[in-house]
Curated annotation (Swiss-Prot):
Name the UniProt record assigns to this protein: Lipoyl synthase 2
Source species of the chain: Thermosynechococcus vestitus (strain NIES-2133 / IAM M-273 / BP-1)
Cystine pairings recorded for this chain: none
Pathway as given in its UniProt record: Protein modification; protein lipoylation via endogenous pathway; protein N(6)-(lipoyl)lysine from octanoyl-[acyl-carrier-protein]: step 2/2
Cofactors: [4Fe-4S] cluster
């Protein structure tokens, strides 16, 4: 049953310094680029900006999927790929003095390479302008093989560019994949993480789950075991918060104590880096391996 009560106290958090948030917002407008921090209204964005970390959203603000939890635009034709986007993002990284950057993207099932090439081009542009900046990738699943490149080929392009970490979020337990992740599958996401390890075992892999959609503790633990079976190194666990009334409702607010328990279970299962808490998101404290 969905919850309609007010947010628990542990989910209320100040946004951080207004000056840091406004600086990033101004640069985003200036360069015509996008961040998932702003598009997804992340509660941690002020904290991350203060730590010189940001997550850039590649390939425009419109997704070809329609996941029921996500704030990102969907439902109409995506924009043409901006060939200047890598250069613009690199300029923003340099201006902000970012030490750690996460690159993610909307799903672009309409493109022959599903957007993999834009990840590679953006990594190259950032490294040219800011050679000391580390780059983490948070990719879609590249499972729509209608184009010229298979899922494995798309992933291989990015792995060859040697990101500091390769992140792909499983998002929820097996039973809830259909209603939560329209267009994605549990097996396809596990295959992304397995493929990265097959191509380069030295690149750390990472995944994340949203809790509060109706999953049980037993289902969460089974999902963590599945992630470890494909060699996933790092994990984030956070509370699902619907961006609007038209998104999937919350079924349960997991307490900080429950998150701590799950985090300890994850460490016992062998994850090297674990961030588990109500306001944790997939890029939260990413520079620390979280």
């Amino acid at each position: 049953m969905a919850l309609s009560r007010p947010l628990p106290s542990w989910l209320r958090k100040p946004l951080g310094k207004a000056s840091e948030i406004s600086t990033v917002q101004r640069l985003v407008r200036q360069y015509g680029i996008h961040t998932i921090c702003e598009e997804g209204r992340c509660p941690n964005r002020g904290e991350c900006y203060g730590q010189k970390t940001a997550t850039f959203l590649l390939l425009g603000p419109t997704c070809t999927r329609a996941c029921a939890f996500c704030q990102v635009e969907k439902g109409h034709a995506p924009a043409a790929v901006d060939p200047e986007e890598p250069t613009k993002i690199a300029a923003a990284v340099a201006t902000l003095g970012l030490r750690y950057v996460v690159l993610t993207s909307v799903a672009r099932d309409d493109l022959p390479d599903q957007g993999a090439g834009q990840f590679v081009a953006t990594m190259a542009a950032i490294r040219q302008r800011c050679p000391g900046t580390e780059i983490e990738v948070l990719s879609p699943d590249f499972r729509m093989d209608r184009g010229r490149l298979s899922q494995r080929d798309c992933i291989a392009q990015i792995v060859a560019a040697q990101p500091a970490c390769y992140n792909h979020n499983l998002e929820t337990v097996r039973r809830l994949q259909g209603p939560v992740r329209r267009g994605a599958t549990y097996e396809s996401s596990l295959r992304v993480l397995a493929t990265v390890k097959e191509l380069n075992p030295d690149i750390p892999t990472k995944s994340g789950l949203m809790l509060g959609l109706g999953e049980t503790e037993a289902e969460i633990i089974e999902t963590l075991k599945d992630l470890r079976r494909v060699g996933c190194d790092r994990l984030t666990l956070g509370q699902y918060l619907p961006p609007s009334l038209s998104h999937l409702p919350v079924v349960k607010y997991w307490t900080p104590e429950e998150f701590n328990t799950l985090g300890n279970i994850a460490r016992e299962l062998g994850f090297s880096h674990v961030r588990s808490g109500p306001l944790v998101r997939s890029s939260y404290h990413a520079a620390e391996g979280g």
